[in-house]
């Protein structure tokens, strides 16, 4: 059990038979009446976001999540197949379960899979990934006086804005949280 006073961004709670992650929270102490905590919760299963208000000090069940490191081995139709490198068990996840992170997922990549009651609910990618640029416009010297950017498609199909000097075949480092270019990789 966790008190609503202890809510922080990223806290996971169990409510109405689902796992919810606290996206935003605000402790409110009105001049008249008792204090309360206003929250925005995101469902780990469906991705829905709801606003919910808790009384200050209200006890809520905390969700017990298990985190395991799995390797993405291959695609089978629309499913992503992952393997536990210790037990060699395979786990299949749909694109919806993986979410937006699937655009950076490539075979052989290790990710953390978060499970609740033995059901995978979320995939955590590394903070940065190194991918090869497969498609981009050629950058011509003297195009701009200051640093400009152009769109580039990487090997997984994701589109990232990169500096003008990046060309096809180069490996670049991308921040998976902000979808931004971090630098070249050799």
UniProtKB/Swiss-Prot annotation:
Gene3D superfamilies: 2.30.30.30, Nucleic acid-binding proteins. The keyword Cell wall biogenesis/degradation does not apply. InterPro entries: Elong-fact-P_C (IPR015365), NA-bd_OB-fold (IPR012340), Rib_uL2_dom2 (IPR014722), Transl_elong_fac_P/YeiP (IPR020599), Transl_elong_KOW-like (IPR013185), Transl_elong_P/YeiP_cen (IPR001059), Transl_elong_P/YeiP_CS (IPR013852), Transl_elongation_fac_P (IPR011768). It comes from the Bacteria. One of its GO terms (cellular component) is cytoplasm. It is found in: Cytoplasm. Signal peptide: none annotated. Keywords: Cytoplasm, Elongation factor, Protein biosynthesis. Pfam families: EFP, EFP_N, Elong-fact-P_C. One of its GO terms (biological process) is peptide biosynthetic process. One of its GO terms (molecular function) is translation elongation factor activity. The keyword Protein biosynthesis applies. Involved in peptide bond synthesis. Stimulates efficient translation and peptide-bond synthesis on native or reconstituted 70S ribosomes in vitro. Probably functions indirectly by altering the affinity of the ribosome for aminoacyl-tRNA, thus increasing their reactivity as acceptors for peptidyl transferase. Belongs to the elongation factor P family. This is Elongation factor P. It comes from Synechococcus sp. (strain RCC307).
């Amino acid at each position: 059990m966790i008190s609503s006073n202890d809510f922080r961004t990223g806290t996971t709670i169990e409510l109405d038979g689902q796992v919810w992650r606290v996206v935003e929270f605000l402790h409110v102490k009105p001049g008249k009446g008792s204090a309360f905590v206003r929250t925005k919760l995101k469902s780990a299963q469906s991705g829905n976001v709801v606003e919910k208000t808790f009384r200050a000090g209200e006890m809520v069940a905390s969700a017990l999540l298990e985190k395991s490191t799995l390797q993405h081995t291959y695609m089978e139709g629309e499913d992503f197949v992952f393997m536990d490198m210790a037990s060699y068990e395979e786990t299949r996840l749909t694109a919806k379960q993986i979410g937006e992170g699937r655009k950076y997922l490539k075979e052989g990549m290790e990710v953390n899979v978060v499970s609740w009651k033995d059901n995978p609910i979320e995939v955590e990618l590394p903070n940065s990934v190194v991918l090869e640029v497969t498609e981009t416009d050629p950058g011509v010297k003297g195009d701009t006086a200051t640093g400009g950017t152009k769109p580039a498609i990487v090997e997984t199909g994701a589109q990232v804005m990169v500096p003008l000097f990046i060309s096809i075949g180069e490996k670049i480092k991308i921040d998976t949280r902000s979808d931004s270019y971090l630098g070249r990789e050799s």
